[in-house]
């Protein structure tokens, strides 16, 4: 029994903790707020950004696969053109014996047309990949910016109540009044 009453007497002699106050150091407060906002953005935005990048990666890979299929088709056409070229060369040998040179021109035109077609397809593939990459980067930038703004507004709205707002305004008016008084 004596120990129990001694404990209550001991608690009565403890000093009280300091009171809760408003930190008026704007630079330190903003640094803390920015740290919290950046931490929240990283924590919540990491998953969304990863999903967005994964989706974009799948689209780009799909575009690459499509381009590769086009390339294979073009190579098949090239192989057919080579077979046709061989046939034309055989015919050319026959016509050369007869003195015709028209087949040689047809061969060159066929090779040039196939080469131009391949170059155009390769150029088209490269342009498609470039524009898809640019579009993906722009979408990611826009999404990250929107999430950052929404997160910051949410944090501000949840932390800023009317009483805190009025106290901040009064403190700033006091600071401005002190500056005006010094002039």
Curated annotation (Swiss-Prot):
The lineage of its organism: Eukaryota, Viridiplantae, Streptophyta, Embryophyta, Tracheophyta. InterPro entries: ATP_synth_b/b'su_bac/chlpt. F-type ATPases have 2 components, F(1) - the catalytic core - and F(0) - the membrane proton channel. F(1) has five subunits: alpha(3), beta(3), gamma(1), delta(1), epsilon(1). F(0) has four main subunits: a(1), b(1), b'(1) and c(10-14). The alpha and beta chains form an alternating ring which encloses part of the gamma chain. F(1) is attached to F(0) by a central stalk formed by the gamma and epsilon chains, while a peripheral stalk is formed by the delta, b and b' chains. It comes from Sorghum bicolor. In plastids the F-type ATPase is also known as CF(1)CF(0). It is found in: Plastid, Chloroplast thylakoid membrane. PANTHER family: ATP SYNTHASE SUBUNIT B, CHLOROPLASTIC. Keywords: ATP synthesis, CF(0), Chloroplast, Hydrogen ion transport, Ion transport, Membrane, Plastid, Thylakoid, Transmembrane, Transmembrane helix, Transport. The keyword Cell membrane does not apply. The chain crosses the membrane at residues 25-45. It comes from the Eukaryota. It is a single-pass membrane protein. This is ATP synthase subunit b, chloroplastic. GO terms for cellular component: chloroplast thylakoid membrane; proton-transporting ATP synthase complex. F(1)F(0) ATP synthase produces ATP from ADP in the presence of a proton or sodium gradient. F-type ATPases consist of two structural domains, F(1) containing the extramembraneous catalytic core and F(0) containing the membrane proton channel, linked together by a central stalk and a peripheral stalk. During catalysis, ATP synthesis in the catalytic domain of F(1) is coupled via a rotary mechanism of the central stalk subunits to proton translocation. Pfam families: ATP-synt_B. Belongs to the ATPase B chain family.
């Amino acid at each position: 029994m004596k120990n129990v009453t001694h404990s209550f007497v001991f608690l009565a002699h403890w000093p009280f903790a300091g009171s809760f106050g408003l930190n008026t150091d704007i630079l330190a407060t903003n640094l803390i707020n920015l740290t919290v906002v950046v931490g929240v953005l990283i924590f919540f935005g990491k998953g969304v950004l990863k999903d967005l990048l994964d989706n974009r990666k799948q689209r780009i890979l799909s575009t690459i696969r499509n381009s590769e299929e086009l390339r294979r088709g073009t190579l098949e056409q090239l192989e057919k053109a080579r077979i046709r070229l061989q046939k034309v060369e055989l015919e050319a040998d026959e016509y050369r014996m007869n003195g015709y040179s028209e087949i040689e021109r047809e061969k060159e035109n066929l090779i040039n047309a196939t080469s131009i077609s391949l170059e155009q397809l390769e150029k088209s593939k490269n342009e498609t990949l470039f524009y898809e990459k640019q579009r993906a980067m722009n979408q990611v930038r826009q999404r990250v910016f929107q999430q950052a703004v929404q997160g910051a507004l949410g944090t501000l709205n949840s932390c800023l109540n009317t009483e805190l707002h009025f106290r901040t305004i009064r403190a700033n008016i006091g600071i401005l009044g002190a500056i005006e008084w010094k002039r």
